[in-house]
Amino acid sequence: MAATLQRIERLSSRVIRVLGCNPGPMTLQGTNTYLVGTGPRRILIDTGEPSIPEYISCLKQALTEFNTAIQEIIVTHWHRDHTGGIGDICKSINNDTTYCVKKLPRNPERKEIIGNGEQQYVYVKDGDIIKTEGATLRVVYTPGHTDDHMALVLEEENALFSGDCILGEGTTVFEDLYDYMNSLKELLKIKAKVIYPGHGPVIHNAEAKILQYISHRNIREQQILTVFHENFEKSFTAMELVKSIYKDTPEHLHKMAQHNVLLHLKKLEKEGKIVSNTDPEKKWKAHL
C-alpha cells in the first residue's frame, strides 16, 4: 500500500515538500515539488501538472506559512507532470520580476516553449551551481528517464533531488536503458545520505535504494535472457515476454512493462545477444 503524504510537509530545515495534487498510476501520490532554502526567497524544484488549482492553493499556503517567495524555478525534466504547472504559477503567484525557469536542454537540442511561448527556459549544464540562502544545489546530468533529466545535489545536507530517476516507491520508466544504468552508477558515486524523489516518500537509505534499482534492472535483463536460452529456436514479441516475466504485475501495467522490455531488447540486440525479425510483427530470438 502506498504511503500517505501530507500536501505540505517540512522535511528538513531547508526542504519543504508541496504535493502536486495529481495522484495516479504513474505519479503515485502526485508530483513532489520542493521549496529549497531558508531565506525569504527560495528555489522551487518542479511544478506539477497544468490546471490543478489545489496545487496552486497549496503552494501559496506553503509560501505564506513559511514567510517566503519563489526565487526561481528548476525543472528536473520536460515531462508534463514536472513542467506543466509553470504557467499557472507565473499567472497566479505574484513576483516582483518574471520567474527564471531553469532546466537542461533536450539532447539532441530542440526548441522548447513554456505555455504559449511567453517565457523561455534558461538552460543550465552538468556541474552548474545554483544558490539561494541556506542552500547550494549542484546540477547532475542523469539521462535515461528522459534525454534532458537532471538530479540536484543539496550540498548542505549531502542529499539528492532525484527527479524521476529514482522514485520513493516502486521503479521508474526510462527512454534509454544504457544511459539510465550509467546515470544510476553516477548517482551512486555521490554517496548521498537521503533522496528527495520526484514521486513518493523520502528515501533515507539512499545507497541501498540505488543499488536495488541497479540490481532490479540486471535481474530483469537476466530473466529476458533466460527465456531466450530456454527457448533457443523460438521468437517472442515484447508482450509475450512481459506475460512470461511480469506474472505478478497487474495487467493494466503491462503496457508500461512492455516499454521497459523493449528497451532491454534494444540493448541486448545492440550487444549482439539477440536478433529481431519483423514477419509479420517484430519478434526477437537468441543469437547463435
UniProtKB/Swiss-Prot annotation:
Residues annotated with N6-succinyllysine modification: K273
Uppermost EC category: hydrolase
Entry's cofactor comment: Binds 2 Zn(2+) ions per subunit.
Record-listed Phosphoserine modification sites: S235
Principal localisation: mitochondrion
Binding site for Zn(2+) 2: D81, H82, E118, D164, H199
One function term, GO molecular function aspect: zinc ion binding
SMART domains, alphabetized: Lactamase_B
Family matches, as InterPro entries: LACTB2-like_MBL-fold, LACTB2_WH, Metallo-B-lactamas, RibonucZ/Hydroxyglut_hydro, Sec-metab_biosynth-thioest, WH-like_DNA-bd_sf
EC number: 3.1.27.-
Keyword Ribosomal protein: no
Quaternary structure and partners: Monomer.
Protein's name according to its UniProt entry: Endoribonuclease LACTB2
Species name: Bos taurus
